[in-house]
């Protein structure tokens, strides 16, 4: 039986535009799914149903219908303020009080015409790829004994389970790509500075940038176009990327056309190999092999490339710790209520000297220069997105040092794209076989890392893989519930 959530975000937008469904009807459909299904998934921490209905009903009076996401239901990652709604930040350490103003990313999505259904779950302050917090557990819809990854945990689960047609997350070390890979989605981390509302210059190292989580490559292009479109709002970040796009056309067009022949490097090794025991599951290797096979059939050149052996891991850890050191300054915070991992990161961050932080930043700058140089002859570099299958609930444990090491071993290829500012996309090329020790049908993704400003090439290659592997037809059980 056909239902509205079976449509892609692009198709749904077109339906609304042509009058085959109203924004309110679409909003009601998705709210009903959230009410029926989310208790077993934990994608949302707050559902603002009445506010969503009121906005959808009056959307034509609030936002021009020409806006790129007009009428599409969405949700806000619970790290970003929406006026009148509490921002929980995945923590029990803060009082539950309504935010006074919208974060620029939230305002940009409103300006694009979306209808927010509420706030989606994130681990504490977005500082982990876990999906377990003191506020609750977010579960993977492909196997609810397993985690969806993080930190855009709730956003990924909501899209995969058909609770929203698409979502925007933020990615400071893999936080869009990790949960997208674990839940069978496309996840795109744009180049640093590409998205004006969140240009990647806040926080130490300029690591974080907003990006889409979608079921198809074309939907990812559509959301990226919306994120970079002028909003009519005051410019929050005057230093956003200004690479001219003249003649290249919208990102959506690149994703739909899927044209081009490129040179792809298949990466051997990771930047964490000297520090963490990175064990790559055969299913992760099989995903890369499947992608290599299809890319070769399409006509791309495929070569091996070795990971440069330059310092990285300790400097990244210092950057992560130093970003946690600011948390004691958050108004009203109760540090005794922090989870063990974040409390440990805060303590280590506060013990750092300014010289140590500056040295780490210098090391990461040198790493970026070396990495971009090593990748320069390729249009994209291919890695597994995750080294392992989606992790069981509780796998990270309570020891913070081991927790951090496990995060790095699980996603050893994601954070280097944040450090270098390069765009990267995860693509859900396969699932585990039935005879896999962790069970069959678990999503496995590959990552393509592009050149600076190279999102269109990543989207084009993703579209070529999608046409042949047809992952957009693969869904978890909740899809038909």
Task: Name each model-derived stretch.
Residues 189-285, 468-481:
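A short helix-breaking turn/cap at a secondary-structure junction
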Residues 19, 71, 111, 164, ...:
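Glycine-rich, small-residue loops and helix-cap segments
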Residues 30, 52, 220, 264, ...:
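Residue-level signal for inorganic ion chemistry
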Residues 101-231, 418-431, 436-447:
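Short glycine/serine-rich loop segments
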